[in-house]
Amino acid sequence: RYFVLRNYEKLPAQNIGKDVDIIVEPSRLKEAKRILKSIYRNNGLLYYDEAVFDRLNCTHGMGIENHTGIHIDLIGGYLVRGYEIYTFEELYAHTKWYNGFCVLDEFFDGIMLFIYKQFGYGTPKLKEKYKDGIYNTYKKYPKEFQEEIARITSSAFAEKMVDHIEKK
């Protein structure tokens, strides 16, 4: 079991991000890595490199002859600064199929964008596309959004965040 975390909208024809993040069941991470290596190899990406940080495997497949490079992050579950806010099972319960890929549903896609950008992102200034994604999710699911942020943080924090989001 797996899902693509974000930037999946134009896959497989085009990647709109710098990489593709694939969240896999933690117990299947080694198997996912083996499958990914064979996919790279079968598509002419014969040079393989990876950097491993705990459950994050940053993989690069490169093909000299076809001048192609692909960066896919395989992640066993989802951690933010070492903290597991949601288990793989909790996240997987909020997935759907989109263009042949398993992805988060609309609500959780927005929640995870908020969590990643709020707690795990190094740059304090949000890009407009991220602001828009968070804002649109909040506007479509205001009660659920605030309740979920309050559940994983606190009611006071959720209120402050909603105030900021509403001001966009």
Predicted feature descriptions by range:
Residues 1-20, 24-168:
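Conserved NTP-donor binding/palm subdomain of two-metal-ion nucleotidyltransferases/polymerases, i.e.
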